[in-house]
Amino acid sequence: MKTMFALLFAISASAANLDPFFAVLGKVESSNNSKAVNKKETALGIYQIRPAYFKDSRVKGNHEQVFNPAFARSVCEAYFKRYEPAAFASGDFETLARCHNGGCGWRKNKSATDSYWKKIKKNL
């Protein structure tokens, strides 16, 4: 039991605190509006998650569930763990922001995410 507790403590102690990042992400994406809809992009919820992003996250459920902020965060976290695991683990807000905005291939055209990163950084 002590070993299990020590392991759980070590894991939680080493995990990055992403709360500030998600607070800013919600502010930048939707002004913290969990019911936000971008009809042009079919982006939904507080983090403006598109259908392809949702599908790539591999989270069970359906795209409309991202109106629930906790569910939306779990989608983003799964997406980040899949495409930027080191950044997720270390709390690299810049990489996570660029990935969220530019998709999993954002590194091919990093400059396309520059203005988005500036918005996030300004609000941190």
Name each region found by the language model.
Residues 16-18, 40, 89-93:
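Extracellular/periplasmic catalytic domains that process cell-envelope and extracellular macromolecules
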Residues 37-47, 51:
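Extracytoplasmic strand-loop-helix segments at the start of, or within, the mature domains
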Residues 18-33, 49, 76, 96-104:
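Short, functionally critical alpha-helical segments immediately adjacent to catalytic or ligand/cofactor-binding
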Residues 20, 41-44, 71:
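Short, well-structured alpha-helical interface segments that form or flank functional binding sites
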Residues 51, 55-107, 117-124:
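Alpha-helical segment that forms one wall of the substrate-binding/catalytic cleft
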Residues 33-37, 56-58:
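Short, solvent-exposed loop/turn elements at domain surfaces
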Residues 3-13:
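Sec-dependent N-terminal signal peptides
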Residues 36-38, 111-112:
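Short, solvent-exposed loop/turn and secondary-structure capping segments
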